[in-house]
Design a protein with these regions (language model features):
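Short, low-complexity disordered leader/linker segments with a strong preference
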Residues: 1-29, 54, 82, 104-111, ...
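Hinge/cleft segment of the Venus flytrap/periplasmic-binding protein
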Residues: 24-27, 37, 156, 160-164, ...
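Extracytoplasmic "Venus flytrap"
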Residues: 28-48, 52, 56, 61-78, ...
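Short beta-strand elements in bilobed, periplasmic/extracellular small-molecule ligand-binding domains
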Residues: 55-67, 156-161, 177-197
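Hydrophobic alpha-helical
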Residues: 78-108, 176, 189, 193-251
């Protein structure tokens, strides 16, 4: 059991641990590592994790993340967590391949690995995430129905991704494209915004200039950017996307987004910490993969999610 603790200015909490017994203070050290600390998606995940830690009373939880979505910076955060005495690392991998060697080294050092939201290639004890392929297909079907209901059966559609490596958003894109198979709609090549709202807005505006009638955002940043571009288009293009933040909900309420697929990051964080404690105690962890589900938020039900 590791006894040291990491004191870092950019960390917000405490930590998880790997072993059989708790540290001398009676707590297991758990590190939650997300892609950044900007998106409300990650804030809600930390809220859920902290709730579980407070309920259990034997978890020392630390939330750490790079300032931007970047593989090398996330690898550095993982290494800092290991050096700081992590027993368990809960991580949303920015890139499934890039981070895997660091996770392998962490595991070899005795750190237990749990994935939340976005897994890497290295095998973990458990993954708590959205079934992103299915959720992406649901987004596609929702948009397809909206267009068909308006008598629109063909046209160009743009897709804004985060990057080409993030497993979760790539799977959403694949599911979205599946929904439009065997239709007369043309789905253009995906453009990437690195989760940056301003960059996503520019991409969406370019799609509009290319004659797109709709645009799909695969995460919070790309969805906000898409919604802002739709607003500036005067409603000649429609948007649909992912995640639930105050800005996203406002865009839905005001009609710039016809719908968003709301994940449950708080559930991922909460159940991740519960899983970490069970792992430390040597208890059965159940299924290796848990789908934490999505809700479809539209203008009609948006107030229920505020």
């Amino acid at each position: 059991m590791k006894l040291s603790k990491l004191a870092l200015a950019f960390a917000f909490g405490a930590a998880l641990t790997t072993g059989v017994q708790a540290a001398e203070d009676g707590k297991y050290s758990v590190f939650l590592i997300t892609m950044d600390q900007i998106d409300q998606h990650w804030v809600r995940m930390n809220d859920g994790a902290q709730k579980a830690a407070n309920e259990l009373g034997n978890i020392d939880l630390t939330w750490m993340a790079p300032d931007i979505k970047d593989d090398s910076k996330q690898i550095e955060v993982v290494n800092n967590a290991v050096a700081g005495g992590a027993d368990v690392i809960m991580i949303a991998a920015n890139g499934p391949t890039a981070i895997s060697s660091s996770l392998k080294e962490a595991n070899a050092a005795g750190v237990k690995i749990i994935y939340v939201d976005s897994p890497a290639d290295f095998p973990a004890l458990k993954t708590l995430a959205t079934n992103n392929m299915a959720a992406g297909e649901t987004a596609g079907k929702t948009l397809l129905k909206h267009l068909n209901d308006k008598g629109i059966t063909e046209g160009r559609i743009g897709i804004i991704g985060v990057n080409a490596a993030t497993n979760s958003t790539v799977s959403r894109e694949m599911g979205f494209r599946t929904a439009f198979a065997n239709t007369n709609f043309e789905l253009l090549e995906t453009q990437y915004c690195d989760g940056d709202t301003a960059k996503a807005k520019d991409i969406a505006a370019n799609y509009y200039n290319l004659g797109c009638i709709a645009v799909f955002g695969t995460n919070e940043g790309s969805t906000v950017g898409a919604g802002n571009a739709v607003r500036e288009s005067g409603g000649e293009m429609v948007g649909i996307g992912f995640d639930k933040s105050d800005m996203v909900l406002s865009l839905v309420k005001n009609g710039q987004l016809i719908a968003v697929m709301a994940q449950n990051p708080d559930v991922m964080g909460y159940e991740g910490v519960k899983t970490a404690e069970k792992a430390m105690k040597g208890e059965d962890l159940g299924e290796e993969y848990v789908d934490t589900g999505v809700s479809i938020i539209t203008k009609e039900n948006v107030e229920q999610f505020r």
